[in-house]
A protein has these predicted regions:
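Hydrophobic alpha-helical interface/terminus motif in multipass membrane transporters
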Residues: 60, 93, 149-150, 182
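N-terminal secretory/membrane targeting signals
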Residues: 1-24
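Final/C-terminal transmembrane alpha-helix of multipass membrane proteins
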Residues: 9-17, 162-183
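Transmembrane helix boundary and interhelical junction motifs in multipass membrane proteins
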Residues: 47-60, 137-148
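Mid-bilayer segments of alpha-helical transmembrane spans in multi-pass integral membrane proteins
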Residues: 84, 135-140, 172-173
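Membrane-interfacial helix-loop-helix
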Residues: 20-42, 66-134, 155-158, 165, ...
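Hydrophobic alpha-helical transmembrane segments of integral membrane proteins
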Residues: 15-16, 45-48, 54, 81, ...
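Interfacial loop-to-transmembrane junctions
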Residues: 3, 149-170
């Protein structure tokens, strides 16, 4: 009976969440839409783990033609808000990882990979290592990963929040400068 309940919960989650997430990432908001609707959309897009600020800033500036400074501020703040949410819901995340097998398998693999990538930096440099890890705007190095690393390594939450926040600001600066063409990107 418990297995049926678990399968039902996972199925309902996948049926409800995945189409919404896919739709949100591919939606084309008409140019004549209200400014608040576009800002809200950009704020929400920033909360998707695979996208975060690395995708939201180019989306804001290049597609929606939002002012660079405003986009930088809005998206940076949204991305910083992820860290306290991870800290707040850490026990729930662990509970779900134990109770929902597919989520648990994915989560455990992700955590093991994160530990391998972050351990040298965090062990050697602590606060600064976490900051540098988050500041590099590559997939898997954003606010989500930074907050998870802080939890995994048992870092002080205030210090970790500060490190992740500074890392997010650093990553936002790098991405914004790249979008503006100041930092040339060579994609092979």
């Amino acid at each position: 009976m418990k297995k049926i309940i678990k399968i039902t919960i996972v199925s309902v989650f996948l049926i409800l969440f995945l189409p919404v997430a896919a739709k949100a990432l591919t939606i084309q908001i008409p140019k004549e839409s209200s400014q608040i609707k576009i800002w809200f959309y950009l704020f929400i897009v920033t909360f998707f783990p695979a996208v975060e600020l690395r995708g939201a800033i180019p989306l804001a500036v290049l597609l929606y033609k939002e002012p660079v400074l405003f986009s930088f501020i809005l998206i940076t703040i949204a991305n910083i808000l992820i860290t306290p949410l991870i800290f707040l819901f850490w026990n729930l995340i662990l509970f779900l990882a134990k109770k929902i097998k597919p989520f648990g398998i994915f989560f455990n693999k992700y955590i093991v990979g994160l530990q391998k990538r972050a351990k040298p930096l965090v062990d050697k440099y602590g606060f600064w290592g976490l900051l540098i890890f988050v500041a590099i705007p590559l997939p898997g190095t954003g606010a989500y990963s930074g907050a998870l690393i802080a939890e995994i390594f048992g870092m002080n939450k205030w210090k970790a929040f500060f490190a992740v926040s500074l890392g997010v600001i650093g990553a936002s600066i790098i991405v914004t400068l790249a979008v503006m063409g100041i930092i040339p990107l060579k994609i092979k």
